[in-house]
């Protein structure tokens, strides 16, 4: 945000930010893929003067949903792989928008069904945003059927171990699903391994 013209200071654990007038567009390359940094930079750039180019962005579904929302309000945001280009506008307008379903919540329910030998159906949900996690649950023995925007999942009688689970930026295994998968693997038959690559 400093590259967009913001001044800030950190005091007592709080960030105090200010700008003299309007933010200005710039070219920014993130040294590390970060969801929070990508989201905040996109929001700030929407009303900045000129064009902002963000490189090495996070591309989680929630970020794409955020940009769809902002575009519906008048923002000018385009994606090119992990590069995001934002042409600043003078203002945003009122809009009506339906926020996407929570993929971590859906994934957690799917793990719970696998864990408890349950029978679960999730409706009005785009399964592609948790396809990596669903593949892991299939390996664990769950029976999964995807029909349009429905997921049907039946937990196995015996849970199979999964070797070499690794969290990664989307479309990899979500770090927020790591603890749920760990619980599942605790009662699996055999030895499993999970590597946390995002927060540790």
Enumerate the language-model features and the residues they cover.
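Short, structured segments at the rim of ligand-binding sites
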Residues: 1-200
């Amino acid at each position: 945000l400093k590259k967009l013209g913001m001044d800030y200071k950190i005091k007592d654990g709080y960030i105090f930010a200010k700008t003299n007038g309007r933010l200005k567009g710039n070219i920014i390359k993130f040294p590390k893929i970060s969801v929070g940094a990508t989201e905040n930079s996109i929001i700030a750039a929407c009303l900045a003067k000129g064009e902002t180019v963000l490189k090495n962005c996070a591309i989680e579904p929630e970020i794409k949903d955020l940009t769809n929302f902002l575009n519906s309000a008048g923002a000018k945001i385009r994606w090119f792989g992990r590069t995001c280009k934002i042409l600043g506008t003078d203002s945003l307008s009122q809009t009506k928008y339906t926020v996407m379903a929570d993929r971590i919540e859906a994934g957690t329910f799917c793990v719970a069904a696998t864990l408890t030998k349950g029978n679960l159906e999730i409706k009005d949900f785009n399964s592609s945003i948790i396809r990596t996690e669903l593949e892991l649950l299939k390996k664990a023995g769950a029976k999964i059927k995807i029909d349009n925007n429905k997921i049907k999942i039946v937990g196995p009688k015996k849970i199979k171990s999964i070797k070499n689970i690794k969290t990664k930026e989307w479309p990899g295994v979500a770090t927020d699903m790591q603890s749920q998968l760990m619980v599942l693997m605790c009662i699996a038959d055999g030895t499993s391994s999970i590597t946390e690559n995002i927060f540790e």
